[in-house]
């Protein structure tokens, strides 16, 4: 993480970093009728039929979260990387992250998702993948575009739509572990962070403006956690920051839909006052727990009806198969498409489960141990050979061929 004193210098250097991310266009120019469009509360495919989103999230692949590794205290990408570096050193950690990105999601995973009846995948990603900032073992040669290019190709082969979701925005948009931030949504108070957010989205949109596989761009995930005393003040800034991102994208891309999530875990849509500032926007909500009934989401339905635009449940899950089946029925009855969270993680509550490798419990123990001083790190650190083997065994365990297919979970989603 670079600390620069002057805003102008910061932006200049960040621009240089972005310039190194690649210039290749994903496809040749296509006409606007090749893309999914909006008609009232419906999404319409190029052939004129309705698209009802059903699918999953590729969570943890490009935005690691602690609980998917069975870590609790070590819960953000930054914390996980720091812990691994303390455990096995920075060079081995960098090698681990490359192997992780190469194997956690592959062409075979995308084919499997399609075979389960899905039509859409949501890709959560970290903004750092498109900068020169240290992230997942890389610095100046970040691989965000290479990873997305591969996923676009795999989705095209499997006839799946792709939503690009900036899960971790510059400065942090949530203020919690899920945005890998410093505990506050600084994005809304920082012009520098907002400029970087716009610059990254402009470059992403310029690269994929002619790619019909991409359904849309989700500007950021779950803005403004409910913990902050100035929550309402932050909520008042939300729509304006969204508008800045939309404007940046529209400089280069008029084809794609843009998705806007509500405040407070994508559940509060009161901050939105203007649904007409762009003719290709839709809204996205999230929900975990509660009753699987229409009454439980009536406020979301009411907002959707008031703006007469599509609403989509971008995240939902971590419940019983019976609950999920009932709620999927509720969403289908109310024309709210869905992508369940996540596709893959340790144990269950996902399409496929990763079996913890031998001695993984020792890594979990280290992740939870006090590590505030060098003495504490030394005292808590398990044997190097064992730790390194457990991490490499995790890479094998996360491959689709070695995962446990959660048949009941998949059936509960009603995608076939």
Locate predicted features.
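Bacterial N-terminal signal peptides that target proteins for export
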Residues: 1-8
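Hydrophobic helical h-region of N-terminal Sec-dependent signal peptides
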Residues: 9-14
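C-terminal motif of bacterial Sec signal peptides marking the signal peptidase cleavage site
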Residues: 17-20
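Bacterial lipoprotein signal-peptidase II cleavage site
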Residues: 22-27
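Active-site mouth of glycoside hydrolases
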Residues: 31, 35-257, 262-271
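Extracellular glycoside hydrolase catalytic/binding regions
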Residues: 33-36, 195-345, 350-367
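Low-complexity, flexible helical/coil segments
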Residues: 77-79, 87-96, 158-161, 200, ...
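Extended, alpha-helix-rich binding/interface surfaces that flank or overlap catalytic cores
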Residues: 330, 337-339, 344-416
């Amino acid at each position: 993480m670079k600390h620069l004193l002057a805003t102008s210098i910061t932006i200049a250097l960040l621009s240089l970093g972005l310039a190194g991310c690649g210039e290749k266009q994903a496809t040749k120019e296509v006409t606007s009728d090749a893309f999914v469009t909006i008609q009232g509360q419906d999404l319409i495919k190029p052939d004129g039929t309705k698209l009802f989103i059903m699918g999953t999230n590729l969570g943890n692949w490009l935005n690691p979260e602690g609980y998917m590794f069975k870590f609790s205290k070590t819960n953000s990408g930054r914390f996980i990387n720091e812990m691994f570096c303390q455990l096995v050193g920075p060079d081995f950690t960098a090698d681990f992250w490359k192997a992780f990105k190469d194997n956690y999601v592959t062409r075979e995973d995308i084919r499997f998702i399609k075979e389960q009846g899905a039509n859409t995948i949501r890709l959560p990603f970290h903004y750092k993948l498109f900068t020169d900032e240290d992230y997942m073992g890389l610095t100046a040669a970040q691989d965000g575009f290479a990873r997305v290019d591969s996923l676009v190709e795999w989705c095209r082969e499997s006839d799946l739509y792709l939503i690009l979701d900036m899960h971790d925005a510059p400065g942090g948009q949530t203020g919690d572990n899920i945005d890998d931030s410093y505990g506050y949504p600084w994005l809304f108070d920082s012009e520098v962070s907002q400029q970087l957010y716009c610059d990254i989205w402009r470059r992403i949109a310029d690269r994929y403006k002619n790619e019909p596989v991409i359904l849309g761009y989700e500007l950021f995930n779950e803005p403004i956690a409910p913990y902050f005393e100035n929550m309402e003040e932050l909520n008042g800034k939300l729509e304006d920051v969204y508008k800045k991102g939309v404007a940046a994208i529209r400089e280069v891309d008029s084809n794609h839909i843009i998705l806007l999530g509500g405040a407070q875990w994508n559940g509060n849509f009161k901050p939105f006052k203007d649904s007409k500032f762009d003719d290709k926007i839709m809204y996205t909500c999230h929900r975990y727990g509660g009753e699987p009934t229409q009454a439980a989401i009536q406020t979301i339905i009411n907002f959707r009806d008031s703006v007469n635009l599509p609403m989509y449940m971008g995240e939902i899950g971590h419940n019983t198969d019976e609950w999920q089946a009932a709620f999927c029925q509720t969403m289908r009855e109310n024309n709210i498409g869905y992508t369940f969270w996540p596709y893959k993680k340790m144990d269950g509550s996902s399409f496929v489960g990763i079996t913890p490798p031998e001695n993984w419990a020792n890594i979990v123990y280290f992740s939870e141990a006090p590590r505030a001083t060098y003495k504490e790190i030394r005292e808590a650190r398990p044997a190097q050979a064992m730790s390194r083997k457990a991490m490499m065994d995790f890479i094998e365990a996360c491959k689709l061929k070695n995962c446990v297919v959660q048949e009941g979970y998949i059936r509960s989603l009603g995608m076939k």
